[in-house]
A protein has these predicted regions:
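Basic/polar, cationic surfaces and motifs that engage anionic cell-wall
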Residues: 1-9, 13-16, 20, 92-163
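N-terminal catalytic cores of peptidoglycan-degrading enzymes
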Residues: 1-78
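Hydrophobic faces of well-ordered beta-strands that scaffold small-molecule active sites
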Residues: 28, 85-87, 124-126
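Cell-envelope and extracellular/periplasmic
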Residues: 32, 80, 85-95
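General N-terminal targeting signals
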Residues: 43-45, 73-75, 81-84, 102, ...
Length: 163
């Protein structure tokens, strides 16, 4: 109930309808355009000429919009589109740091996805880990904060498994 499903339409690159081969990792991204909302980014993915997409976008108020079914490929992580679920995250400024509401929702969503897919907390990676792109920039520039994020996801996953 915490996810607002607004699937984008099938078109060219952003949503091809091609099935994932397997799900091996959850990839965290940042949108790269400070101050934009989850809805802004979802609507951008839905344009016919857009060549990128993500399974989820997490907004500045902590809202979560699902853009693609979990079983379909996104256009977000280059050669890893075939085996990853991608989460794009909104941020208020150029540092790329997530605000508290956004951070809380990203942790919750990531843990839920790990539980749903049977993956572990070790299966959470940055776009940077796939391509070397500075994404999400805050967590590339602050590896200690990335480790803290992954620890928070593992804690949340453990709590979900207890329920």
């Amino acid at each position: 109930d915490f996810i607002d499903s607004q699937l984008i339409h099938v078109h060219t690159t952003a949503r091809t309808g091609i099935q994932l081969e397997d799900i091996k990792d959850i990839v965290i991204h940042y949108v790269g355009n400070p101050g934009t909302t989850a809805q802004n980014n979802r609507d951008f993915f839905d344009k016919d000429d857009t060549e990128v997409s993500s399974h989820f976008v997490v907004g500045l108020k902590g809202e979560i919009i699902q853009c693609l079914p979990l079983w379909e490929r996104s256009a977000a992580s280059n050669n890893r589109n075939k085996d990853t679920i991608s989460i794009e995250v909104c941020h208020p400024d150029g540092t790329g740091k997530f605000n508290d509401a956004t951070y809380t929702s990203v942790v919750k969503l990531t843990a839920w996805l790990l539980k749903e897919t049977g993956l572990s907390g070790d299966n959470v990676i940055r776009h940077y880990d796939v391509t070397g792109k500075l994404c999400p920039i805050y967590y590339v520039n602050n590896p200690d904060k990335w480790e803290a994020f992954k620890k928070d996801v593992k804690t949340s996953l453990a709590e979900l498994k207890e329920k």
